[in-house]
């Protein structure tokens, strides 16, 4: 899963990296020690060993690892960069939990720290992928392994150093939002989930900024700009049922409508129970054929929801 901010910044300028973000956050509460063994799950030491084996196979090194209260960083990025990245993750995680608890969700961190593979630069990222990353790729959250992969963008794009803080923060926040969504009780990696739901949550969070009150859930102007630039509309019923809208031709609009959907459902307290019920029902299904039934049951008639979202879009486009 990768972030794309339409209109104002291309995915190339948004990209990679992350670790340089926000020295003003400080190093945060970093700790050492191992987690207790959880049946069926790797211990922290085992996780470090697995990641280091993967990185050494890509001929990366020297390797370091850094811990914060809820995150574990492993990679060839310097420890100072790892600490800065984890400080961002911790600050976002705290705001994330507060925000979603305030909207009726039961959310908690998992027992074990979340893994962040923190790489030195784009070359290290390419080595890990065993392929040159596309110009639109800027780190990613790996749904299968449940790991966030980031790298330091500054060394590759000296020409935009002045933008580095914004670029790095956006990328890190979007991808960490995915990791938090799938690990705090909102989403489940093991079920069939429409892409628009996971991307809608990530875009709902992606403009978070440290030290800004109520920074999660604000109006996402770049996504609105993508709606403005679009010449078409993807019916919400189609977006919830068919993930092909996230192919390159229509992905900008798909991201924008995903943000609009989640923002609309969470903005008003009267709609929040519908969204919580929808997510709870989705947790119990792993069949794509169930998508329409679950959405209609919990969110109401999809044609009506589509009409409401078009009205919502028009309101923002007039603003």
Feature names for model-found ranges:
Residues 60-189, 194, 285-297:
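Juxtacatalytic substrate-recognition/specificity segment
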Residues 140-148, 167, 188-319:
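Acidic/His/Gly-enriched intrinsically disordered linker/tail segments
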Residues 1-10, 20-23:
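N-terminal secretory signal peptides
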Residues 20, 25-29, 183, 208, ...:
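Short hydrophobic alpha-helical membrane-anchoring segments
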Residues 28-54:
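C-terminal segment of N-terminal export signals and the immediately downstream linker at the start
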């Amino acid at each position: 899963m990768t972030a794309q901010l339409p209109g104002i910044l291309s995915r190339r300028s948004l990209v990679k990296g992350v670790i340089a973000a926000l020295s003003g956050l400080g190093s945060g509460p970093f700790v050492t020690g191992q987690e207790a063994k959880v049946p069926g799950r790797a211990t922290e030491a085992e996780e470090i060993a697995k990641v280091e084996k993967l990185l050494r196979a890509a001929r990366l090194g020297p390797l370091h690892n850094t811990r914060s209260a809820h995150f574990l960083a492993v990679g060839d990025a310097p420890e100072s960069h790892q600490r800065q990245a984890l400080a961002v993750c911790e600050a976002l995680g705290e705001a994330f939990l507060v925000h979603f608890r305030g909207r009726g969700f039961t959310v908690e961190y998992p027992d074990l720290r979340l893994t962040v593979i923190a790489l030195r630069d784009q070359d290290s990222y390419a080595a890990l992928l065993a392929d040159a990353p596309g110009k639109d790729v800027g780190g990613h959250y790996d749904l299968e392994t449940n790991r966030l992969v980031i790298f330091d963008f500054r060394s590759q794009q000296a020409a935009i150093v002045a933008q580095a803080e914004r670029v790095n923060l956006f990328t890190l926040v979007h991808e960490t939002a995915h990791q938090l969504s799938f690990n705090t009780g909102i989403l489940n990696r093991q079920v069939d989930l429409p892409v628009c739901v996971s991307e809608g949550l990530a875009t709902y969070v992606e403009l978070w900024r440290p030290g800004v009150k109520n920074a999660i859930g604000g109006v996402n102007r770049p996504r609105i700009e993508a709606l403005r630039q679009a010449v078409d509309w993807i019916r919400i019923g189609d977006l919830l049922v068919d993930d092909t809208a996230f192919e390159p031709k229509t992905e900008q609009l798909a991201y924008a409508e995903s943000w609009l959907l989640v923002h609309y459902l969470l903005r008003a307290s009267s709609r929040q129970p519908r969204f919580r019920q929808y997510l709870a029902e989705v947790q119990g299904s792993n069949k794509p054929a169930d998508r329409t039934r679950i959405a209609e049951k919990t969110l109401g008639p999809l044609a009506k929801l589509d009409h409401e979202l078009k009205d919502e879009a028009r309101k923002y486009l007039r603003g």
